[in-house]
A protein has these predicted regions:
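Asp-based, Mg2+/Mn2+-dependent phosphohydrolase catalytic module
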Residues: 1-4, 69-70, 92, 96-99, ...
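N-terminal helical cap/lid subdomain that shapes the substrate entry/recognition surface
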Residues: 2-101, 113-117
Length: 219
């Protein structure tokens, strides 16, 4: 097996993206009045055409500009908490399975600091060799510097690390650009109507993580 480490996104991979949806919807409604139907339409439109930041798009759509984006995200981060039902059991099993195969494990995720506490509660924290949470490291995907930091901290060549995420634009493409291998997980904020190019972008494309350790071992 050529892969020696795996980096995981959190939302859509280990936990449901519904936690972010709940938080940002609540935060928007603290600043203005937004219906669930209008919110869902903007959210879905972005998933189908993921051009730029979803957070910025929501801010512009409902607050008229980016002037209050920092305030919006401050409010959202206070509510951005995973509950027990948000955890993907196949994600947890895949992470544990890859660790048992001898891989180093990293996190590369745009998340608030509180997500590290959730990893501790779910007994995943101690399995992690590099904790890359945006609020803690000061980078956000798709910034290549975030992935470069993971490569440096895992102390392996890029082509021996595989990144697992559910976004082509913020996970697969930036990781590939640095020579990392990639897994595209088609759930959560993944484009529901992928192009042929999307389907061919990653080394592995899956709808769930049930067989991920075996698929990575076979690379």
């Amino acid at each position: 097996m050529k892969v020696k480490a795996a980096t995981f996104d959190i939302g859509g991979v280990l936990y449901s993206d519904d936690a972010f949806k709940r938080a940002i919807f609540s935060a928007l409604n603290q600043l203005t009045k937004v219906s669930a139907a209008d919110f869902d339409q903007v959210y879905l439109d972005h998933l189908k055409q993921p051009d730029g930041s979803l957070r910025s798009k929501l801010c512009i759509s409902f607050l008229g500009s980016l002037d209050k984006k920092s305030e919006l995200m401050r409010l959202a981060n206070e509510k951005w908490l995973f509950n027990d039902d948000d955890q993907y059991q196949d994600g947890k099993a895949a992470l544990i399975g890859l660790k048992q195969l001898g891989l180093k494990i990293g996190i590369v995720a745009n998340q608030p600091a509180a997500s590290s506490e959730r990893l501790k509660k779910d007994n995943l924290f101690d399995l992690i060799d590099f904790l890359g949470i945006s609020a803690l490291v000061g980078f956000e995907k798709p910034d290549p510097a975030f992935f470069k930091l993971a490569i440096k901290e895992l102390d392996l060549p890029a082509d021996q690390i595989i990144h697992i995420g559910n976004r082509i634009d913020t996970d697969v493409n930036p990781a590939k650009s640095l020579g990392m291998k990639t897994v595209w997980v088609r759930r959560g904020e993944a484009n529901p109507n992928p192009s042929k190019a999307d389907l061919e972008a990653a080394d592995i494309t899956v709808g769930d993580l049930k067989n991920l350790p075996e698929l990575i071992k076979a690379l």
